[in-house]
Amino acid sequence: MISFSRLRIGAKPSLVVACILLGLAACPALAGMAIEEVETSSGIKAWLVQDYSLPIVTTRFAFRGGRTQDPSGKEGIVNLITELLDEGAGNLDSDAFQERLDDAGAEMLFEAGPDAVYGNMRVLAERKDEAFQLLRLAIEQPRFDQQPVDRLRAQIVSSILARAKDPETAAQFAWMRAIYGDHPYSRREEGTVQTLAAVTTSDLKAVHERIFARGNLTIAVVGAIDPGTLKRDLDRIFGGLPAGPSLTPVVDAVPKLGRAIRVAYDLPQAQLSLAYPGIPRKDPQFFAANLMNQILGGGAFTSRLWNEVREKRGLAYGIYSTLENIDHASALVIGTGTRPDRAAETLSLIQAEVRRMSEEGVSEDELTAAKKKLIGGYAIENLNSSSAVAQTLVQIQLEDRGIEYVERRKQLIQAVTVEDVRAVAKRLLSADPTVMTVGPSLKGTNR
Protein backbone atom coordinates (compact mmCIF):
# COMPACT_ATOMS: atom_id res chain seq x y z
CA MET A 1 0.00 0.00 0.00
CA ILE A 2 2.98 2.28 0.16
CA SER A 3 3.96 4.22 -2.93
CA PHE A 4 7.64 5.08 -3.02
CA SER A 5 8.80 8.45 -4.22
CA ARG A 6 11.51 8.76 -6.83
CA LEU A 7 14.95 7.76 -5.61
CA ARG A 8 17.43 10.32 -6.82
CA ILE A 9 20.97 9.08 -7.46
CA GLY A 10 23.00 11.80 -9.01
CA ALA A 11 26.36 12.17 -10.69
CA LYS A 12 28.54 11.44 -7.67
CA PRO A 13 26.96 8.69 -5.55
CA SER A 14 28.82 5.79 -7.14
CA LEU A 15 30.93 5.39 -3.99
CA VAL A 16 27.80 5.37 -1.83
CA VAL A 17 26.19 2.72 -4.01
CA ALA A 18 29.35 0.61 -3.98
CA CYS A 19 29.58 0.86 -0.21
CA ILE A 20 25.92 -0.09 0.17
CA LEU A 21 26.40 -3.15 -2.00
CA LEU A 22 29.48 -4.12 -0.04
CA GLY A 23 27.50 -3.51 3.13
CA LEU A 24 25.17 -6.37 2.31
CA ALA A 25 28.06 -8.70 2.97
CA ALA A 26 28.86 -6.90 6.22
CA CYS A 27 25.35 -7.27 7.62
CA PRO A 28 26.08 -10.19 9.97
CA ALA A 29 27.91 -7.66 12.16
CA LEU A 30 24.52 -6.11 12.88
CA ALA A 31 23.18 -9.34 14.35
CA GLY A 32 24.55 -8.41 17.77
CA MET A 33 23.79 -4.73 17.37
CA ALA A 34 23.58 -2.41 20.35
CA ILE A 35 20.70 0.04 20.17
CA GLU A 36 20.99 3.23 22.21
CA GLU A 37 18.60 6.12 22.57
CA VAL A 38 19.96 9.63 22.18
CA GLU A 39 18.15 12.83 23.06
CA THR A 40 19.11 16.32 21.98
CA SER A 41 18.98 19.49 24.05
CA SER A 42 15.72 20.39 22.29
CA GLY A 43 14.13 17.05 23.18
CA ILE A 44 14.48 15.26 19.83
CA LYS A 45 14.97 11.53 20.36
CA ALA A 46 16.42 8.86 18.09
CA TRP A 47 17.57 5.27 18.26
CA LEU A 48 21.16 4.79 17.15
CA VAL A 49 23.14 1.75 16.04
CA GLN A 50 26.80 2.62 15.58
CA ASP A 51 28.42 0.69 12.74
CA TYR A 52 31.81 1.70 11.37
CA SER A 53 32.25 -1.23 8.99
CA LEU A 54 31.45 1.21 6.16
CA PRO A 55 31.69 5.03 6.13
CA ILE A 56 27.94 5.48 5.62
CA VAL A 57 25.18 7.06 7.71
CA THR A 58 21.60 5.90 7.13
CA THR A 59 18.82 8.01 8.62
CA ARG A 60 15.21 6.83 8.65
CA PHE A 61 12.37 8.86 10.13
CA ALA A 62 8.60 9.06 10.22
CA PHE A 63 5.97 11.69 10.91
CA ARG A 64 2.71 10.18 12.14
CA GLY A 65 -0.23 11.10 9.95
CA GLY A 66 -0.01 9.66 6.46
CA ARG A 67 -2.65 9.38 3.78
CA THR A 68 -5.40 9.28 6.40
CA GLN A 69 -4.75 13.02 6.77
CA ASP A 70 -5.89 13.74 3.20
CA PRO A 71 -8.75 16.28 3.40
CA SER A 72 -12.05 15.08 1.99
CA GLY A 73 -12.28 15.98 -1.68
CA LYS A 74 -8.49 16.38 -1.94
CA GLU A 75 -7.41 12.78 -1.58
CA GLY A 76 -3.87 12.17 -2.80
CA ILE A 77 -2.44 15.37 -1.34
CA VAL A 78 -0.13 13.67 1.19
CA ASN A 79 1.30 11.44 -1.53
CA LEU A 80 1.79 14.50 -3.74
CA ILE A 81 3.60 16.29 -0.91
CA THR A 82 6.11 13.43 -0.60
CA GLU A 83 6.75 13.62 -4.34
CA LEU A 84 7.48 17.36 -4.07
CA LEU A 85 9.75 17.56 -1.02
CA ASP A 86 12.92 17.20 -3.12
CA GLU A 87 11.61 19.48 -5.88
CA GLY A 88 12.91 22.69 -4.34
CA ALA A 89 13.28 23.98 -0.79
CA GLY A 90 14.48 27.13 0.93
CA ASN A 91 16.26 29.35 -1.59
CA LEU A 92 16.87 26.44 -3.98
CA ASP A 93 14.49 25.78 -6.84
CA SER A 94 13.99 22.25 -8.16
CA ASP A 95 17.02 22.18 -10.45
CA ALA A 96 19.33 23.79 -7.90
CA PHE A 97 18.17 21.46 -5.13
CA GLN A 98 18.70 18.35 -7.23
CA GLU A 99 22.13 19.57 -8.32
CA ARG A 100 23.18 20.10 -4.71
CA LEU A 101 21.86 16.67 -3.78
CA ASP A 102 23.85 15.12 -6.61
CA ASP A 103 26.97 17.00 -5.50
CA ALA A 104 26.56 15.61 -1.98
CA GLY A 105 26.33 12.08 -3.40
CA ALA A 106 23.34 11.39 -1.16
CA GLU A 107 20.21 9.33 -1.58
CA MET A 108 16.99 10.92 -0.35
CA LEU A 109 13.49 9.52 -0.61
CA PHE A 110 10.07 10.13 0.90
CA GLU A 111 6.98 7.95 0.92
CA ALA A 112 3.41 8.28 2.12
CA GLY A 113 2.04 5.37 4.13
CA PRO A 114 -1.51 5.12 5.41
CA ASP A 115 -0.56 6.27 8.92
CA ALA A 116 2.79 8.04 8.54
CA VAL A 117 5.00 9.94 6.14
CA TYR A 118 8.43 8.33 5.92
CA GLY A 119 11.79 9.74 4.94
CA ASN A 120 15.16 8.17 4.31
CA MET A 121 18.68 9.44 3.63
CA ARG A 122 21.91 7.54 2.99
CA VAL A 123 25.16 9.40 2.63
CA LEU A 124 28.88 8.99 3.11
CA ALA A 125 29.84 10.13 6.61
CA GLU A 126 32.26 12.72 5.23
CA ARG A 127 29.47 14.34 3.15
CA LYS A 128 26.70 14.20 5.70
CA ASP A 129 26.79 17.87 6.73
CA GLU A 130 25.85 19.16 3.29
CA ALA A 131 23.35 16.33 2.78
CA PHE A 132 21.70 16.93 6.15
CA GLN A 133 21.34 20.62 5.30
CA LEU A 134 19.37 19.64 2.20
CA LEU A 135 17.27 17.24 4.23
CA ARG A 136 16.50 20.04 6.69
CA LEU A 137 15.34 22.29 3.88
CA ALA A 138 13.24 19.55 2.28
CA ILE A 139 11.22 18.79 5.41
CA GLU A 140 11.13 22.29 6.89
CA GLN A 141 10.95 24.65 3.92
CA PRO A 142 9.57 22.89 0.81
CA ARG A 143 8.76 25.45 -1.88
CA PHE A 144 5.87 23.77 -3.73
CA ASP A 145 6.64 25.89 -6.78
CA GLN A 146 3.93 25.76 -9.42
CA GLN A 147 6.03 24.21 -12.19
CA PRO A 148 7.05 21.07 -10.26
CA VAL A 149 3.57 20.86 -8.73
CA ASP A 150 2.01 20.80 -12.20
CA ARG A 151 4.62 18.36 -13.52
CA LEU A 152 4.33 15.86 -10.68
CA ARG A 153 0.55 16.12 -10.58
CA ALA A 154 0.44 15.41 -14.33
CA GLN A 155 2.67 12.37 -13.86
CA ILE A 156 0.43 10.98 -11.13
CA VAL A 157 -2.71 11.64 -13.17
CA SER A 158 -1.12 9.88 -16.14
CA SER A 159 -0.41 6.87 -13.92
CA ILE A 160 -3.99 6.87 -12.62
CA LEU A 161 -5.41 6.95 -16.15
CA ALA A 162 -3.04 4.22 -17.33
CA ARG A 163 -4.23 1.92 -14.56
CA ALA A 164 -7.91 2.82 -14.86
CA LYS A 165 -8.68 -0.32 -16.89
CA ASP A 166 -6.27 -2.57 -15.02
CA PRO A 167 -8.26 -5.37 -13.35
CA GLU A 168 -5.86 -5.64 -10.43
CA THR A 169 -6.26 -1.94 -9.66
CA ALA A 170 -10.04 -2.15 -9.90
CA ALA A 171 -10.10 -5.27 -7.75
CA GLN A 172 -7.87 -3.72 -5.09
CA PHE A 173 -10.10 -0.67 -4.84
CA ALA A 174 -13.24 -2.82 -4.69
CA TRP A 175 -11.60 -4.90 -1.95
CA MET A 176 -10.63 -1.91 0.17
CA ARG A 177 -14.09 -0.35 -0.20
CA ALA A 178 -15.75 -3.63 0.75
CA ILE A 179 -13.55 -4.14 3.81
CA TYR A 180 -13.26 -0.56 5.08
CA GLY A 181 -16.33 1.20 3.70
CA ASP A 182 -15.99 4.98 3.98
CA HIS A 183 -12.97 4.88 6.29
CA PRO A 184 -9.88 6.74 5.02
CA TYR A 185 -8.16 3.37 4.56
CA SER A 186 -10.44 2.69 1.60
CA ARG A 187 -9.22 5.72 -0.36
CA ARG A 188 -7.05 5.43 -3.43
CA GLU A 189 -3.41 6.00 -2.47
CA GLU A 190 -2.74 8.58 -5.19
CA GLY A 191 -6.18 10.16 -5.13
CA THR A 192 -8.23 10.60 -8.28
CA VAL A 193 -8.02 12.87 -11.30
CA GLN A 194 -10.72 15.05 -9.75
CA THR A 195 -9.27 15.27 -6.23
CA LEU A 196 -5.78 16.06 -7.47
CA ALA A 197 -7.15 18.81 -9.70
CA ALA A 198 -8.66 20.42 -6.61
CA VAL A 199 -5.32 20.64 -4.75
CA THR A 200 -3.76 24.11 -4.56
CA THR A 201 -0.35 25.28 -3.39
CA SER A 202 -2.02 26.66 -0.28
CA ASP A 203 -3.47 23.21 0.42
CA LEU A 204 -0.04 21.62 0.10
CA LYS A 205 1.49 24.08 2.54
CA ALA A 206 -1.37 23.71 5.03
CA VAL A 207 -1.25 19.90 5.13
CA HIS A 208 2.56 19.95 5.33
CA GLU A 209 2.41 22.27 8.34
CA ARG A 210 -0.10 20.00 10.10
CA ILE A 211 2.03 16.85 9.79
CA PHE A 212 5.69 17.88 9.90
CA ALA A 213 6.39 18.64 13.57
CA ARG A 214 8.93 17.57 16.21
CA GLY A 215 6.27 16.07 18.45
CA ASN A 216 5.20 13.83 15.61
CA LEU A 217 8.65 12.48 14.82
CA THR A 218 10.29 9.06 15.10
CA ILE A 219 13.94 8.57 14.08
CA ALA A 220 16.48 5.76 13.71
CA VAL A 221 20.09 6.17 12.58
CA VAL A 222 22.52 3.41 11.62
CA GLY A 223 26.14 3.85 10.64
CA ALA A 224 29.40 5.69 11.17
CA ILE A 225 28.30 8.36 13.62
CA ASP A 226 28.72 8.79 17.38
CA PRO A 227 25.98 9.91 19.81
CA GLY A 228 27.39 13.40 20.36
CA THR A 229 27.64 14.17 16.67
CA LEU A 230 24.18 12.72 16.06
CA LYS A 231 22.61 14.95 18.71
CA ARG A 232 24.06 18.01 17.03
CA ASP A 233 22.91 16.85 13.60
CA LEU A 234 19.39 16.01 14.76
CA ASP A 235 18.91 19.50 16.14
CA ARG A 236 20.21 20.96 12.89
CA ILE A 237 17.88 18.85 10.74
CA PHE A 238 14.68 18.81 12.77
CA GLY A 239 15.08 21.59 15.35
CA GLY A 240 13.39 24.24 13.21
CA LEU A 241 10.12 22.34 12.89
CA PRO A 242 7.09 23.37 14.97
CA ALA A 243 6.75 21.62 18.31
CA GLY A 244 3.44 19.86 17.79
CA PRO A 245 1.36 18.53 14.90
CA SER A 246 -2.29 19.24 14.18
CA LEU A 247 -3.64 15.92 13.01
CA THR A 248 -7.19 14.99 12.16
CA PRO A 249 -8.27 12.17 14.51
CA VAL A 250 -8.70 8.80 12.80
CA VAL A 251 -11.20 6.31 14.21
CA ASP A 252 -10.53 2.59 14.30
CA ALA A 253 -11.82 0.66 11.30
CA VAL A 254 -13.57 -2.66 11.85
CA PRO A 255 -13.29 -4.73 8.66
CA LYS A 256 -16.68 -5.60 7.21
CA LEU A 257 -16.98 -9.39 7.09
CA GLY A 258 -19.46 -11.90 5.70
CA ARG A 259 -19.71 -10.33 2.26
CA ALA A 260 -19.35 -11.78 -1.24
CA ILE A 261 -17.77 -9.55 -3.88
CA ARG A 262 -17.55 -10.51 -7.54
CA VAL A 263 -15.52 -8.52 -10.03
CA ALA A 264 -15.91 -9.76 -13.61
CA TYR A 265 -12.83 -9.52 -15.83
CA ASP A 266 -11.66 -11.54 -18.80
CA LEU A 267 -8.60 -13.01 -17.10
CA PRO A 268 -6.91 -16.39 -17.53
CA GLN A 269 -7.19 -16.99 -13.78
CA ALA A 270 -9.73 -16.40 -11.06
CA GLN A 271 -8.23 -14.47 -8.15
CA LEU A 272 -9.60 -15.37 -4.72
CA SER A 273 -9.25 -13.20 -1.61
CA LEU A 274 -10.69 -13.92 1.84
CA ALA A 275 -10.67 -11.61 4.86
CA TYR A 276 -11.07 -12.77 8.45
CA PRO A 277 -10.74 -10.76 11.66
CA GLY A 278 -7.21 -9.69 12.50
CA ILE A 279 -5.56 -8.92 15.81
CA PRO A 280 -4.01 -5.67 17.11
CA ARG A 281 -0.25 -5.59 17.65
CA LYS A 282 -0.63 -4.97 21.39
CA ASP A 283 -3.08 -7.85 21.89
CA PRO A 284 -1.72 -10.54 24.27
CA GLN A 285 -2.55 -13.17 21.63
CA PHE A 286 -0.65 -11.37 18.85
CA PHE A 287 2.28 -13.79 18.66
CA ALA A 288 0.03 -16.82 18.96
CA ALA A 289 -1.89 -15.43 15.98
CA ASN A 290 1.33 -14.94 14.02
CA LEU A 291 2.38 -18.52 14.65
CA MET A 292 -1.07 -19.77 13.68
CA ASN A 293 -0.89 -17.76 10.46
CA GLN A 294 2.59 -19.13 9.72
CA ILE A 295 1.24 -22.67 9.90
CA LEU A 296 -1.96 -21.90 7.99
CA GLY A 297 -0.55 -20.04 5.00
CA GLY A 298 2.31 -17.76 5.96
CA GLY A 299 5.10 -20.26 5.47
CA ALA A 300 6.09 -20.55 1.82
CA PHE A 301 6.20 -24.20 0.66
CA THR A 302 5.45 -25.51 4.17
CA SER A 303 2.01 -24.22 5.15
CA ARG A 304 -1.20 -26.22 5.32
CA LEU A 305 -2.82 -24.21 2.53
CA TRP A 306 0.22 -24.70 0.30
CA ASN A 307 0.20 -28.42 0.94
CA GLU A 308 -3.51 -28.91 0.32
CA VAL A 309 -4.08 -26.46 -2.54
CA ARG A 310 -0.77 -26.55 -4.39
CA GLU A 311 1.05 -29.77 -3.57
CA LYS A 312 -1.77 -32.29 -3.32
CA ARG A 313 -4.14 -30.92 -5.96
CA GLY A 314 -2.20 -28.48 -8.14
CA LEU A 315 -5.01 -25.94 -7.99
CA ALA A 316 -2.72 -22.90 -7.78
CA TYR A 317 0.86 -21.86 -8.36
CA GLY A 318 0.91 -20.15 -5.00
CA ILE A 319 -1.26 -19.36 -2.01
CA TYR A 320 -0.65 -17.27 1.09
CA SER A 321 -2.19 -15.98 4.28
CA THR A 322 -1.02 -12.88 6.09
CA LEU A 323 -1.87 -10.85 9.16
CA GLU A 324 -2.22 -7.26 8.01
CA ASN A 325 -1.79 -4.57 10.66
CA ILE A 326 -2.11 -0.84 10.28
CA ASP A 327 -2.64 1.65 13.07
CA HIS A 328 -6.43 1.54 13.10
CA ALA A 329 -7.29 -1.84 11.61
CA SER A 330 -6.18 -5.44 11.32
CA ALA A 331 -7.25 -8.43 9.25
CA LEU A 332 -6.13 -11.92 8.32
CA VAL A 333 -6.13 -12.18 4.53
CA ILE A 334 -5.83 -15.26 2.32
CA GLY A 335 -5.13 -14.99 -1.40
CA THR A 336 -4.55 -17.25 -4.40
CA GLY A 337 -5.17 -17.57 -8.13
CA THR A 338 -6.63 -20.61 -9.89
CA ARG A 339 -8.33 -21.73 -13.09
CA PRO A 340 -11.83 -20.26 -13.35
CA ASP A 341 -13.41 -23.72 -13.59
CA ARG A 342 -11.65 -24.73 -10.34
CA ALA A 343 -12.43 -21.56 -8.38
CA ALA A 344 -15.34 -23.05 -6.44
CA GLU A 345 -13.31 -26.15 -5.54
CA THR A 346 -10.35 -24.04 -4.45
CA LEU A 347 -12.50 -21.74 -2.32
CA SER A 348 -14.19 -24.70 -0.66
CA LEU A 349 -10.83 -26.29 0.12
CA ILE A 350 -9.45 -23.06 1.62
CA GLN A 351 -12.47 -22.68 3.86
CA ALA A 352 -12.23 -26.31 4.93
CA GLU A 353 -8.61 -25.78 6.00
CA VAL A 354 -9.58 -22.63 7.88
CA ARG A 355 -12.33 -24.55 9.69
CA ARG A 356 -9.89 -27.33 10.56
CA MET A 357 -7.49 -24.79 12.04
CA SER A 358 -10.32 -23.15 13.98
CA GLU A 359 -11.59 -26.44 15.39
CA GLU A 360 -8.40 -28.47 15.86
CA GLY A 361 -5.57 -25.98 16.26
CA VAL A 362 -2.00 -27.12 15.55
CA SER A 363 0.39 -29.86 16.59
CA GLU A 364 3.51 -29.49 18.72
CA ASP A 365 5.70 -30.27 15.71
CA GLU A 366 3.98 -27.61 13.59
CA LEU A 367 4.35 -25.05 16.36
CA THR A 368 8.03 -25.82 16.91
CA ALA A 369 8.77 -25.42 13.20
CA ALA A 370 6.81 -22.17 13.02
CA LYS A 371 8.71 -20.75 15.99
CA LYS A 372 12.04 -21.51 14.33
CA LYS A 373 10.88 -19.79 11.16
CA LEU A 374 9.59 -16.64 12.88
CA ILE A 375 12.66 -16.29 15.06
CA GLY A 376 15.25 -17.21 12.44
CA GLY A 377 13.63 -15.32 9.61
CA TYR A 378 13.36 -12.04 11.49
CA ALA A 379 17.02 -11.09 11.12
CA ILE A 380 17.07 -12.14 7.47
CA GLU A 381 13.99 -10.10 6.61
CA ASN A 382 14.40 -7.11 8.93
CA LEU A 383 18.07 -6.75 9.89
CA ASN A 384 19.87 -7.64 6.66
CA SER A 385 21.27 -4.17 5.88
CA SER A 386 21.72 -0.80 7.53
CA SER A 387 18.64 0.49 5.72
CA ALA A 388 16.59 -2.49 6.86
CA VAL A 389 17.76 -2.01 10.45
CA ALA A 390 16.84 1.68 10.40
CA GLN A 391 13.45 0.91 8.91
CA THR A 392 12.79 -1.80 11.50
CA LEU A 393 13.80 0.44 14.40
CA VAL A 394 11.48 3.20 13.24
CA GLN A 395 8.61 0.73 12.97
CA ILE A 396 9.29 -0.67 16.44
CA GLN A 397 9.10 2.86 17.84
CA LEU A 398 5.90 3.65 15.96
CA GLU A 399 4.38 0.50 17.43
CA ASP A 400 5.62 1.51 20.92
CA ARG A 401 7.27 -1.87 21.54
CA GLY A 402 10.33 -0.65 23.43
CA ILE A 403 14.05 -0.59 22.72
CA GLU A 404 14.54 -4.20 23.91
CA TYR A 405 11.95 -5.57 21.48
CA VAL A 406 14.35 -7.28 19.07
CA GLU A 407 15.56 -9.55 21.89
CA ARG A 408 12.27 -9.73 23.80
CA ARG A 409 10.43 -10.84 20.66
CA LYS A 410 12.21 -14.21 20.79
CA GLN A 411 11.00 -14.81 24.34
CA LEU A 412 7.42 -13.87 23.47
CA ILE A 413 7.39 -16.31 20.56
CA GLN A 414 8.98 -19.13 22.54
CA ALA A 415 6.38 -18.73 25.28
CA VAL A 416 3.43 -19.51 22.98
CA THR A 417 1.81 -22.91 23.57
CA VAL A 418 -0.36 -25.18 21.44
CA GLU A 419 -3.29 -24.16 23.62
CA ASP A 420 -2.58 -20.47 22.93
CA VAL A 421 -2.67 -21.09 19.18
CA ARG A 422 -5.87 -23.12 19.41
CA ALA A 423 -7.58 -20.34 21.35
CA VAL A 424 -6.61 -17.57 18.94
CA ALA A 425 -7.48 -19.73 15.91
CA LYS A 426 -10.98 -20.24 17.28
CA ARG A 427 -11.26 -16.53 18.03
CA LEU A 428 -10.23 -15.32 14.56
CA LEU A 429 -11.22 -18.08 12.17
CA SER A 430 -14.74 -18.88 13.39
CA ALA A 431 -16.04 -15.73 11.69
CA ASP A 432 -17.76 -15.70 8.31
CA PRO A 433 -15.20 -14.10 5.97
CA THR A 434 -15.58 -11.60 3.20
CA VAL A 435 -14.73 -13.33 -0.08
CA MET A 436 -13.80 -11.60 -3.33
CA THR A 437 -13.56 -13.40 -6.65
CA VAL A 438 -12.04 -11.67 -9.67
CA GLY A 439 -12.15 -13.40 -13.03
CA PRO A 440 -14.13 -14.42 -16.09
CA SER A 441 -16.27 -17.11 -14.50
CA LEU A 442 -17.84 -16.51 -11.13
CA LYS A 443 -20.20 -19.46 -11.03
CA GLY A 444 -20.14 -21.71 -8.03
CA THR A 445 -18.12 -19.45 -5.75
CA ASN A 446 -20.91 -18.62 -3.29
CA ARG A 447 -19.95 -19.65 0.19
UniProtKB/Swiss-Prot annotation:
InterPro entries: Metalloenz_LuxS/M16, MPP/UQCRC_Complex, Peptidase_M16_C
Pfam families reported for this sequence: Peptidase_M16_C
Source organism superkingdom: Bacteria
Stored Gene3D superfamilies: Metalloenzyme, LuxS/M16 peptidase-like
MF GO annotations: metal ion binding
PROSITE patterns: PROKAR_LIPOPROTEIN
Keywords, ordered alphabetically: Plasmid
Family: Belongs to the peptidase M16 family.
Protein's name in the database: Uncharacterized zinc protease-like protein y4wB
